[in-house]
């Protein structure tokens, strides 16, 4: 019984310590999505630009080391040539390291994100093509995609600037990848 009480106290202390030490980030991002289609000898790339908003929480790993794990959700809408539109929900999970440089903290991070594509379409000469429906025997694009993420946050007081690169780990469609670059500004609370 003493062991159970001791484990309960340790669990409560860990939970309370984690909750009090968490950092919540809110951000608005400029997003560039590069869709690269490899057909034939030359790849074709379509750059799509837009915005995303997101919220995430960073919690310290056990111990006094400056490592954190971060998880959150972003909603992204990007627009490209041929009246292309892509709307996605992104769930990032990453490991961060905190570097204190006086008044500025650098938080380099690496991890994975799961992307759920909500809407993907192109309009050409009055015809709208849905990326996620197979037409004329072509295979449809995948609604779910796994991406890596690499980046860094620079934090000053309660504000931060973030640069992140999200290379595709799974294809958007046959011989088609989607890579993202985000430049974000936000605040912590």
Language-model features and meaning:
Residues 2-5, 27, 59, 153:
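Basic side chains
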